[in-house]
């Protein structure tokens, strides 16, 4: 295995697009992907024809309500004929998509990349049941884990092992609310 380049080429975010974070019964998933993509491209001053790499960050298929949603939504964004890759890392899919785009650009696989993501978890019939299928099938599935219980167990472990306190978690929440309050499209816009 080769070592990473100690001085990789610089990569910059040159455009951003986002739709409001709320229930959108007035728009299809394709509409949301198209709107955010067009806004990001316009903000960057580039066209989809300038894009070499498309990174699709989508939730597990069970939450999207269909198999391989990226294959259906990317054409609506004008991404036909572009090299694409799907990324899914649970609650960190957005940053994982951006990071994947950065690494591919630094690796010389293209000059312009776009990370596109969409979440419509309301389309799943039973969100906890879907999440329960992503845990270890032998040891964890019968426990009935959810994202909340999984995070609570991890937080408890961090408190026992490294001395985190409830105040630390409150600081994280307060910081996140403060950041969200600066984004008028966020789900929670007040600190």
Predicted regions mapped to residue ranges:
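Short, well-ordered amphipathic alpha-helical segments that serve as non-catalytic structural scaffolds
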Residues: 30-45, 69, 97, 152-155
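Metallocofactor- and cofactor-centric catalytic cores in central/energy metabolism, strongly enriched
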Residues: 24-34, 50-56, 61-62, 67-68, ...
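Glycine-/small-residue-rich active-site loops that bind phosphorylated ligands and cofactors
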Residues: 21, 61, 93
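Condensing-enzyme catalytic core mediating Claisen C-C bond formation in acyl metabolism
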Residues: 1-30, 34, 39, 133, ...
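Glycine-/proline-rich flexible loop or hinge segments
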Residues: 18-20, 51-59, 80-87
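N-terminal glycine-rich anion-binding loops that anchor highly charged ligand groups
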Residues: 7-15, 41-52, 61-75
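Acyl-thioester C-C bond-transforming condensing/cleaving domain
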Residues: 2-4, 46-48, 64, 75, ...
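Structural motif
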Residues: 13, 55, 114-116
